[in-house]
């Protein structure tokens, strides 16, 4: 399957020059377009193994030649004047790709005369690919401050004129970023003279470049130098990476050491901070409330003096009324908890027996002592009763149970 498509490319400065020339004249203008036509065939193979060939023709409009008056190479019926046409296109006849016309305040439609003239030009120029560019400027504001320029490109196909797409190439278009496959056909005379003058220094008679072999040798040596530099850069990057790893490792070790030092300093500060003996302070304030000497200093658990001022803090202790001597079993490292419990039980029992014998002898002495008067005997009995904290029943009960009354001891 084969298909054809035609597109035209017009540079921005050529279109700007056409518009500038037309706006600086008082009448319509016309002329010829110069450039080249390129054809490319694209072959696309589908999954069904069918070849799809598409031929794309690109009309590259590069320059223009203007005629300074109308009907300069044709008459009113559209017939071409060969002498006038040869005079206008003396040396660029093979570069003509079409012609143009600028009409003021008209529609984008080809007239009958323009159609006849286009067919006659195809015959005289022996080119069936001629195109016609129609430019129609108009004023869109009453103050004539804004103008509009419309353009359209026509090409005859099967006896009818069809519009073909025209692309105005600007600087910001992505299509112009690629390289051109062929050079422009419309070169200036100055460029040709400059190339002809210096071509003998760079080109041979057959058109090939001189010193191509030396240039290739220089290219090879540059490639070798580039490879060696790349190897050096790779080694240096490896060394830098190793150094960075070492630096990161050392930073981590330094951080760990600093954290360990801070932790040790924090623990040392906590150990140096003395702890107040709250139990001793509360006991002294409870049993000796009027003795300022005992309140004048605060003693820590390790027998260290904290401050010289008296302690006025009320410690929230629930058992301050039942304060007693606290014996720590850690003072006797050779004694086990079971043995210590046994010793405490025996000590309580012996203390109870001793107390019972002492109180019994005490009561016997009072009874055997001769009384002077009845009053004295009653007083002695009352005193003995008051002095003994327990009655006989309580003594018997305590003796049987093995307990003793708790009292504050210092």
Curated annotation (Swiss-Prot):
InterPro entries: BRISC_Abraxas1 (IPR023239), FAM175 (IPR023238), MPN (IPR037518). One of its GO terms (molecular function) is microtubule binding. The keyword Nucleotide-binding does not apply. The modification Phosphothreonine is found at residue 391. Residues 354-410 are annotated as: Disordered. It holds the Pfam family MPN_2A_DUB_like. Keywords: Chromatin regulator, Coiled coil, DNA damage, DNA repair, Nucleus, Phosphoprotein. It is found in: Nucleus. Residues 368-389 have a biased composition (Polar residues). A motif (pSXXF motif) lies at residues 407-410. The keyword Ribosomal protein does not apply. One of its GO terms (biological process) is chromatin organization. Its main location: nucleus. Phosphorylation of Ser-407 of the pSXXF motif by ATM or ATR constitutes a specific recognition motif for the BRCT domain of BRCA1. The modification Phosphoserine is found at residues 48, 387-388, 407. Residues 7-160 form the MPN domain. One of its GO terms (cellular component) is nucleus. Residues 208-261 form a coiled coil. Component of the ARISC complex, at least composed of UIMC1/RAP80, ABRAXAS1, BRCC3/BRCC36, BABAM2 and BABAM1/NBA1. Component of the BRCA1-A complex, at least composed of the BRCA1, BARD1, UIMC1/RAP80, ABRAXAS1, BRCC3/BRCC36, BABAM2 and BABAM1/NBA1. In the complex, interacts directly with UIMC1/RAP80, BRCC3/BRCC36 and BABAM2. Homodimer. Interacts directly (when phosphorylated at Ser-407) with BRCA1. The phosphorylated homodimer can interact directly with two BRCA1 chains, giving rise to a heterotetramer. Binds polyubiquitin. Belongs to the FAM175 family. Abraxas subfamily. Involved in DNA damage response and double-strand break (DSB) repair. Component of the BRCA1-A complex, acting as a central scaffold protein that assembles the various components of the complex and mediates the recruitment of BRCA1. The BRCA1-A complex specifically recognizes 'Lys-63'-linked ubiquitinated histones H2A and H2AX at DNA lesion sites, leading to target the BRCA1-BARD1 heterodimer to sites of DNA damage at DSBs. This complex also possesses deubiquitinase activity that specifically removes 'Lys-63'-linked ubiquitin on histones H2A and H2AX. This is BRCA1-A complex subunit Abraxas 1. It comes from Bos taurus (Bovine). The gene is ABRAXAS1.
């Amino acid at each position: 399957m084969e298909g054809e498509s035609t597109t035209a490319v017009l540079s921005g400065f050529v279109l700007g020059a056409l518009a500038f020339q037309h706006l600086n004249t008082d009448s319509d203008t016309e002329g010829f377009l110069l450039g080249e036509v390129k054809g490319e065939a694209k072959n696309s193979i589908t999954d069904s193994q069918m070849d799809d060939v598409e031929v794309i023709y690109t009309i590259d409009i590069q320059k223009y030649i203007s005629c300074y008056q109308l009907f300069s190479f044709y008459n009113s019926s559209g017939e071409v004047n060969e002498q006038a046409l040869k005079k206008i296109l003396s040396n660029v006849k093979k570069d003509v790709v079409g012609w143009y016309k600028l009409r003021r305040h008209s529609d984008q439609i080809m007239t009958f005369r323009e159609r006849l003239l286009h067919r006659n030009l195809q015959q005289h120029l022996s080119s069936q690919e001629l195109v016609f560019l129609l430019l129609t400027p108009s004023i869109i504001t009453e103050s004539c401050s804004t103008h509009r320029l419309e353009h359209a490109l026509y090409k005859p196909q099967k006896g009818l004129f069809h519009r073909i797409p025209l692309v105005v190439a600007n600087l910001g278009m992505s299509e112009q970023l690629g390289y051109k496959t062929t050079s422009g056909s419309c070169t200036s005379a100055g460029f040709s003279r400059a190339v002809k003058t210096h071509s003998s220094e760079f080109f041979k008679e057959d058109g090939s470049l001189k010193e191509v072999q030396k240039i290739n040798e220089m290219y090879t040596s540059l490639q070798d130098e580039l490879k060696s530099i790349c190897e050096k850069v790779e080694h240096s990057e490896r060394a830098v990476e190793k150094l960075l790893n070492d630096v990161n490792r050392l930073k981590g070790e330094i951080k760990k050491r600093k954290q360990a030092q801070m932790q040790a300093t924090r623990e040392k500060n906590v150990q140096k901070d003395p702890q107040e003996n709250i139990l001793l302070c509360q006991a002294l304030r409870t049993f000796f409330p009027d003795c300022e000497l005992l309140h004048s200093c605060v003693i820590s658990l390790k027998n260290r003096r904290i401050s010289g001022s008296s302690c006025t803090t009320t410690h929230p202790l629930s058992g301050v009324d039942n304060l007693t001597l606290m014996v720590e079993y850690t003072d006797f490292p050779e004694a086990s908890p079971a043995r210590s419990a046994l010793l405490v039980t025996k000590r309580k029992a012996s203390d109870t027996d001793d107390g019972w014998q002492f109180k019994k002898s005490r009561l016997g002495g009072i009874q055997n002592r001769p009384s002077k008067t009845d009053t004295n005997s009653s007083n002695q009995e009352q005193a003995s009763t008051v002095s003994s904290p327990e009655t006989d029943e309580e003594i018997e009960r305590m003796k049987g149970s093995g307990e003793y009354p708790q009292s504050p001891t210092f």
